[in-house]
Regions:
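Extreme N-terminal, non-catalytic leader segments
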Residues: 1-33
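The conserved Walker
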Residues: 40
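ATP-dependent NMP and nucleoside kinases share a basic, alpha-helical "lid"
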Residues: 73-80, 96-156, 163
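Small-molecule kinase domains that catalyze NTP-dependent phosphoryl transfer to phosphate-bearing small molecules
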Residues: 138-197, 201-211
Length: 268
């Protein structure tokens, strides 16, 4: 059997009636995956949780997948051997791809210590031209160990926990992450804002969300901004939908125009 081929036979892929681009035009949301990687105690879950909250408050579809949480269900059959870690990341990469294809900004908070596994996850997105952004949540080992929120470093040092990343199992630092967050030097808010800026830079935020992120925080003002953006979205979708010759580039143009609108609104 070819490497990466399904074990099951007699299966046929069923295509959607909408392309990823058409779905994003109709919903006003472009999916993306932000892959937070780093040592235990680096701050991945903390950054991911607040980032998810900020995105949802901005009107964007977002969902966070956490390394511990998925082991209570989807990956409860996996341990922490090198092979199980590899399968853990493979499964999560596939789940993130599905979420991203549906228009959800997916935040994956996983130690994911091996570069080959992270690269394999990125490749899943590349073949479908979906947005994958690797964020290295960086902190010195001694700082992560001093934090030790789950008491795992203490167990590893005592020998009660074997194969723990950073102690007796390796962590391979990303060489080309789209963003590095030094949580020893940056505040939580600064880290989250850097992630939002990264998403905007790569077009991974819907134009309604970009407008709200930069709009005034007063409830009535936010509601008016949201209403205006939806009207603008519907108008552009109608116009661009009629221009079938330029349809393939319509989405990025829409995001760009409305991103500029959002920034200018904050200065008024």
């Amino acid at each position: 059997m070819a490497a990466g081929a399904p074990k099951a036979q007699n299966i046929v892929w069923s295509d959607s009636l909408l392309s990823t681009h058409e779905r994003s035009l109709l919903t006003g949301c472009r999916g993306a995956t932000i892959w937070l990687t780093g040592l235990s105690g680096s701050g991945k879950s903390t950054v991911g949780a607040l980032l998810e909250k900020r995105l949802i408050e901005s009107g964007l579809l977002a969902y966070r997948l956490d390394g511990d949480n998925v082991r209570f269900g989807l990956n409860k059959d996996l341990g922490f051997s090198e092979g199980d870690r590899k399968e853990n990341i493979r499964r999560i990469g596939e789940v993130c791809r599905l979420f991203t294809d549906s228009g959800v900004v997916t935040i994956a908070s996983f130690i994911s210590p091996y570069k080959s596994d992270r690269d394999a996850a990125r490749e899943i997105f590349a073949k479908d031209k979906l947005l994958f952004l690797e964020v290295y949540v960086k902190v010195p080992l001694e700082v992560a160990e001093a934090r030790d929120p789950k008491g795992l470093y203490k167990k590893a040092r005592s020998g009660a926990l074997k194969g723990f990343t950073g102690i007796d199992a390796p962590y391979e630092e990303p060489a080309a992450a789209e963003l590095t967050l030094n949580t020893q030097e940056m505040t939580l808010e600064e880290c989250v804002q850097k992630c939002l800026d990264l998403l905007e830079k790569h077009g991974g935020m819907s134009f309604v969300a970009i407008y709200l992120v930069f709009a005034p925080l007063h409830a009535n003002a936010r509601a008016r901004c949201c209403s205006l953006c939806r009207i603008f979205r519907d108008l552009l979708t109608s116009v661009l939908g009629a221009c079938k010759g330029v349809r393939s580039g319509a989405g990025s143009y829409t995001y760009m125009v409305c991103g500029v609108m959002g920034r200018s609104s904050a200065t008024r």
